[in-house]
């Protein structure tokens, strides 16, 4: 039997190796230097600290003002708001682009889309695009695999499907470092996929597919229950891998139109359909965190929650809320690039609010840093590790941030100042509302989705804003009196461009023969039962819209 002093030493050693900073323990060690020496000798042979699991949760089309924790006045609070209260909520969180495909490529790689090549005449990968995220790009999944992590993904991909045939799956997630790929949307949820009869009589089977890993399992797909499929797959992955470090990427179809929710959440939010969708996503996130707690790994798991870009404001009440920020999806105004950004790590990250600049591209560098691996040095990373920002409250590693639209540099932020070289036309929400009926969108459109052309204005000298005093970008500053700021902007852009090697444009190579089709003899429809219908609470709104509908 071990003696009591020996057991005491073992317990004390455990406290030291866990990096405990208890004052009583520190006083004991100061008063007993021989004990400290013994502990340190034993400590040389201790096991390394456990690598934290990393969970990345990405919402689609969610604006910076959609969550209660970010100030929405009518949205009910949910579990994501609890994470914001108990974790670190950032007010200056940014994404690498204001549109789905390029933004997601930046999340996966830590690099601006202009470096990767995820731009072109079109803005996103389409089902008939032959290209996808280049295999030469290291993804966060591949980086974490190199660090010894199991890797899993569920939900929306939107980084390419096929290359040479309708079934080769050349660009799907399993080819980019994910060991496990559950139910996933290789393209996206869209207006065309509506199966309720709200926007479409019948969903477009040429755009709407549900896969499991590389297998097409439903075309089109049922919206009802989709979030539950993603969530169940995520829970299964956690259960199967909880004993070892893992990286899990959950890319929700919420909050992209067409909106949908299961019966448990329909007609439950005072905010309407958008609120119902958000409550369903809150529930999914809570189930994921509950599973971590059930397996006693919540305190060894860091969770990032972000959106892929700002809201689609032309969709009115179904498009999301950019809060005080101007613009939305596809825009280089703050409303397009600034997002909710929450990091949650119980017991490690102190609760609080941070005004430091952080980006979606920082996640890969931070995860690699925490996982004990390094990223390649043969390329430029726009993302930086924010480990010290999270754990120590340090200043952001970013002194600047670049806003691109395709391969056009639209604006740059330097400190608190933002200089626009080009701006897209943005109308007031009231004007967008004229294209809606009772808040219900009548058409699938963008007022200005361009990076140059008639709805884009060039500025020379640049249009300058102080984002600390004027985050809504309403009051441009005079050049006179800000000469030093303009010089800093100029030198920052020159340095950036001097090191920039643009990627080859990837979004304009098309071949309609590669579009997924599970059953050509049946109009590419399989495992789908069309049951149009909508909850009663939506019917008055839809009836109002029908009276105003313009084909």
From Swiss-Prot:
It is an enzyme of class 3 (hydrolase). Its EC number is 3.1.6.1. Glycans are attached at residues 164, 213, 296. The conversion to 3-oxoalanine (also known as C-formylglycine, FGly), of a serine or cysteine residue in prokaryotes and of a cysteine residue in eukaryotes, is critical for catalytic activity. Keywords: Calcium, Cytoplasm, Extracellular matrix, Glycoprotein, Hydrolase, Metal-binding, Secreted, Signal. The keyword Protein transport does not apply. Binds 1 Ca(2+) ion per subunit. GO terms for molecular function: arylsulfatase activity; metal ion binding. SUPFAM superfamilies: Alkaline phosphatase-like. Its cofactor is Ca(2+). The active site is at 100 (nucleophile), 158. GO terms for cellular component: cytoplasm; extracellular region. Residues 1-20 form the signal peptide. Ca(2+) binds at residues 60-61, 100, 308-309. The modification Blocked amino end (Gln) is found at residue 21. The modification 3-oxoalanine (Cys) is found at residue 100. It is found in: Cytoplasm; Secreted, Extracellular space, Extracellular matrix. It catalyses: an aryl sulfate + H2O = a phenol + sulfate + H(+). Gene3D superfamilies: 3.30.1120.10, Alkaline Phosphatase, subunit A (3.40.720.10). Belongs to the sulfatase family. May be a structural component of the extracellular matrices involved in cell movement during morphogenesis. This is Arylsulfatase. It comes from Hemicentrotus pulcherrimus.
């Amino acid at each position: 039997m071990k003696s009591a002093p020996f057991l005491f030493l073992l317990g004390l050693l455990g406290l030291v190796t866990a990096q405990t900073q208890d004052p009583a323990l520190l006083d004991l060690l100061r008063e007993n230097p021989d004990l400290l020496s013994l502990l340190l000798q034993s400590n040389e042979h201790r096991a390394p600290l456990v690598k934290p699991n990393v969970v990345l949760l990405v919402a689609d089309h969610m604006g910076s003002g959609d969550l209660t924790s970010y100030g929405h006045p009518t949205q009910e609070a949910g579990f994501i708001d609890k994470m914001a209260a108990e974790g670190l909520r950032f007010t200056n969180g940014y994404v690498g682009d204001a549109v789905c495909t390029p933004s997601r490529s930046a999340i996966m790689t830590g690099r601006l889309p202009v470096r990767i090549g995820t731009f072109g005449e079109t803005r996103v990968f389409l089902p008939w695009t032959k290209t996808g995220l280049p295999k030469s790009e290291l993804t966060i999944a591949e980086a974490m695999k190199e660090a010894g992590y199991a890797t899993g993904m569920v939900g929306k991909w939107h980084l390419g499907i096929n290359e040479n045939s309708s079934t080769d799956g050349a660009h799907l997630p399993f080819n980019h470092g994910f060991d496990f790929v559950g139910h996933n949307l290789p393209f996206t949820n869209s207006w065309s996929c509506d199966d309720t009869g709200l926007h479409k009589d019948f969903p477009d089977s040429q755009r709407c597919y549900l896969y499991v890993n590389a297998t097409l399992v439903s075309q089109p797909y049922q919206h009802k229950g989709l979030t539950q499929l993603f969530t169940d797959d995520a829970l299964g992955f956690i259960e199967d891998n909880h004993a070892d470090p893992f990286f899990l990427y959950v890319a929700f179809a919420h909050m992209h139109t067409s909106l949908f929710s299961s019966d448990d959440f329909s007609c439950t939010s005072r905010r309407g359909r958008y609120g119902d969708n958000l409550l369903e996503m809150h529930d999914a996130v809570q189930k994921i965190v509950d599973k971590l707690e059930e397996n006693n790994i919540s305190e060894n798991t860091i969770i990032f929650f972000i959106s892929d870009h700002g809201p689609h404001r032309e969709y009115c009440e179904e498009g999301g809320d950019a809060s005080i920020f101007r613009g939305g999806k596809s825009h280089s105004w703050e409303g397009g690039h600034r997002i909710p950004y929450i990091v949650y790590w119980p017991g490690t990250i102190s609760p609080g609010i941070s005004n430091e600049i952080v980006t979606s591209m920082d996640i890969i560098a931070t995860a690699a840093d925490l996982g004990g691996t390094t990223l390649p040095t043969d390329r430029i990373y726009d993302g930086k590790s924010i480990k010290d920002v999270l754990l120590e409250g340090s200043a952001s590693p970013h002194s600047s941030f670049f806003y691109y639209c395709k391969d056009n540099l639209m604006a740059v932020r330097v400190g608190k100042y933002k200089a626009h070289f080009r701006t897209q036309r943005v109308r007031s929400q009231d004007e967008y509302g004229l294209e809606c009926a009772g808040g219900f969108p009548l058409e699938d459109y963008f007022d200005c989705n361009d990076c140059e052309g008639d709805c884009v204005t060039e500025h020379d000298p640049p249009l300058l804003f102080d984002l600390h005093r004027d985050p809504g970008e309403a009051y441009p500053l005079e050049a006179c009196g800000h000469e030093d700021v303009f010089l800093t902007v100029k030198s920052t852009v020159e340095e950036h461009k001097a090191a920039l090697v643009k990627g080859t444009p990837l979004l304009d190579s098309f071949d309609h023969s590669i579009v997924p089709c599970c059953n050509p003899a049946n109009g590419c429809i399989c495992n789908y039962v069309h049951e149009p219908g909508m909850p009663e609470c939506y019917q008055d709104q839809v009836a109002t819209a029908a009276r105003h509908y313009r084909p």
